[in-house]
């Protein structure tokens, strides 16, 4: 008797790219499940909203996003929280490429990524910015679905961020998370936290904005901020997702001196 064939699951593929020159959309590409939305905004920087129409990512999926800002100011985000589901095969992969031209500003503030139990995910974020450009970059992770009482016991996450500034390497971060990182007795891991965020500002006046940011850091979320060499970084850890989201929102508004993207307020 022949062995039953292993079913082949449909995999998500998507590519989306947008390029702005000032307030004008210069180039746009989208294919597969990756889409680009350009909301109509008035009196503020143009916003680019990336969307995964598959509703989430799982093993074997591949999404590629790119946003290029030649000059002026642009805000990039995601339409909603992204979900990374249990994988029954290879790792899912999300790649994001950002470029910021001379004197340009990019606020890259996607909404949170929610990790389900059994997730296997690899994310790679690469930024190339001019020496006098400005970057605000936010990354937020929520570990499990609190409303369902989910506790992550099996997960594999590899998260990499790399920034070059004026052609020189300015920042590299590589994060790996596994089941052992969620033990409440592990201060080297997340020490019991289920939501974490990292906010980075790369700007010539980054050090000058540190005190104003520290002034809005909350007391109900573990957080700290520091600045050096044209870079400001704030870290957040929280036992629940909502206090973290609220804290991050205030920090982003303070650092960018502006309102959050409109989709954050839905």
Curated annotation (Swiss-Prot):
UreD, UreF and UreG form a complex that acts as a GTP-hydrolysis-dependent molecular chaperone, activating the urease apoprotein by helping to assemble the nickel containing metallocenter of UreC. The UreE protein probably delivers the nickel. GO terms for molecular function: nickel cation binding. This is Urease accessory protein UreD. Required for maturation of urease via the functional incorporation of the urease nickel metallocenter. InterPro entries: UreD. GO terms for cellular component: cytoplasm. The lineage of its organism: Bacteria, Pseudomonadati, Pseudomonadota, Alphaproteobacteria, Rhodobacterales. It is found in: Cytoplasm.
């Amino acid at each position: 008797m022949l062995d039953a064939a292993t079913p082949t699951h449909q995999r998500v593929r998507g590519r989306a790219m947008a390029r702005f020159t000032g307030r004008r959309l210069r180039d746009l590409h989208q294919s597969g499940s990756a889409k680009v939305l350009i909301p109509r905004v008035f009196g503020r920087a143009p916003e680019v909203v990336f969307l995964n129409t598959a509703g989430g990512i799982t093993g074997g999926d591949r999404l590629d996003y790119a946003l290029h800002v030649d000059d002026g100011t642009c805000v990039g985000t995601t339409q909603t929280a992204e979900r990374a589901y249990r994988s029954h095969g290879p790792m899912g992969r999300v790649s994001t490429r950002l470029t910021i031209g001379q004197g340009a500003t990019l606020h890259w503030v996607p909404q949170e990524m929610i990790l389900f139990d059994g997730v296997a995910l690899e994310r790679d974020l690469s930024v190339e910015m001019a020496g006098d450009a400005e970057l605000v970059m936010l990354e937020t992770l929520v570990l499990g679905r609190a409303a369902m009482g989910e506790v992550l016991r099996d997960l594999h996450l590899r998260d990499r961020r790399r920034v070059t500034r004026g052609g020189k390497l300015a920042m590299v971060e590589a994060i790996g998370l596994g089941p052992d990182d969620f033990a409440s007795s592990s201060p080297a891991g997340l020490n019991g936290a289920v939501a974490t965020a990292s906010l980075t500002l790369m700007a010539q006046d980054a050090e000058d904005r540190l005190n104003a940011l520290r002034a809005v850091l909350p007391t109900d979320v573990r957080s700290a901020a520091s600045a050096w060499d044209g870079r400001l970084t704030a870290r957040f850890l929280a036992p629940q997702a909502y206090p973290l989201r609220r804290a991050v929102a205030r920090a982003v508004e303070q650092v960018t001196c502006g309102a959050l993207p409109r989709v954050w307020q839905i």
